[in-house]
Amino acid sequence: MAVRVYLKQAWNLMKQNPLFSTLYIVGTGISIVMTMVIAIVYYVRLAPVYPETNRMRTLVVKSAKMTNDESTHSANISYAMLKDWFYSLESAEVSTGVFGTSYARVTNDKEEIPTYARYTDENFFRVFPLVFLEGKPFTEADRRSGIHNVVLTDSYAQQLFGTTKGVVGKNFLMDYTNVKVVGVVKSGSFLTPDSYAQVYLPYSCREGYDDEGSHWALGGYRVYILMKESKSVTDVQDEVLELIRKFNVSDMGDGWKLDLVGQPELYWHSTFRLWSNVAVDWGRVIWMFVGIFMVLLFVPAFNLSGMISARMERQLPDLGIRKAFGASRRRLLVQIIWENLLLTGLGTLLGLVIAWIVLALSGYEIFSLFEVFPKFPPKGVNLGMGIDMFFAPLIFVAAALFCLLLNLISALIPAWNALRHPIVESLNEQK
């Protein structure tokens, strides 16, 4: 009941001071816009969003490093390591290898259409559970025999055939090679770069997929490991470290030492890795977020605090009268905080809506601002954000917490200082 009274009084005060209220709401909204844009960008990068819904159980190996007394070589993982080590990990539910992506030319009856293709294996669709609208994944037998059976996204099937229905079994030319459609999946977004493609096909369709390089461990694959629910990250890492130890004491290395530089690592860890052969500098990452938090929270809080202090000076006579009639300092403080919480809440809603509009209109450009080495999306790829990215419960929780913190920091100190004035001094402010 008291909260209802406080909010009613806050609404009346807001109508009595439209200029102050407008400036306060807009100031809060601007701060929330910047905060929510960053929050949503990192949510899309780190949280389990379609089709990368297994991110919390996914470990990544992007590269390996081979070192001897004279030099160091780094590259992606070799086919031999993928086949002999990662496919048979006991702590993994399943592992998948990706032999890169490429831009290919697809020919239908009318024209050539560029495509973004991903070369992988049948396990890919278990690590990244794309929703099949029609058909099924290509099989292990397809991969082993190099059969050109492919999976299309629904958006690309629409572009290629003019429909998403009944395309399984159809053939088309991809880089002048005949391929057959065995499945159609719900399209993801280029904003999830580890899983996105328009066409998925076995890596054995690509020339040189099993080539042996100058070093046994180095090649062209990235590995994604879906660990068993009963296992931990440490279990997977220990199993891989034991394989590395055995390799380094054997004759296979021929004087070279293998190092995976802290990998396998959790998916969200891997997103902060700048260089494939250098471990993540967590000190730099932490200070980066501390700096962002300080700028986005405390700078607007100090500005709003100044506005509230000025208003508190004008309200001293009113506060003095309330105290004279028995209102406690605590009750008045709670009331002032609720008054400002209403304004902060309205600013938060305004900022959240503007943040959604900014992200919807800017597309990939706003996401590329947070990449050290941004990728340039090829023509025709899906850059859209799914509903699970826009309206995630965690985003609303973050907005609410930021709103509460901003309100407390900006309102608490000026309100407390104003309420410390003696009753007589507060009443004299009216003269």
Spans of model-derived segments:
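C-terminal membrane-exit region of the final transmembrane helix in multipass inner-membrane proteins
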Residues: Y6, M389-K431
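Mid-to-C-terminal secondary-structure elements
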Residues: N123-P137, V150-N277
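Intracellular coupling helices
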Residues: L7-L19, F302-L343, N417-E429
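Hydrophobic alpha-helical transmembrane segments of multi-pass inner-membrane transport and secretion
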Residues: Q16-L46, V278-P317, G345, L405-L406
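Membrane-interfacial segments
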Residues: Y42-T53, P317, V358, S362-P374, ...
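Structured, solvent-exposed hinge/loop segments at the ends of secondary-structure elements
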Residues: A39-G166, L173-V179, S368-V381
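Membrane-helix entry/capping segments
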Residues: M1-V5, N12, Q16, F247-G291, ...
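Transmembrane alpha-helical interface segments in multi-pass membrane proteins
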Residues: L19-L23, G27-S31, P317-G363, A398, ...
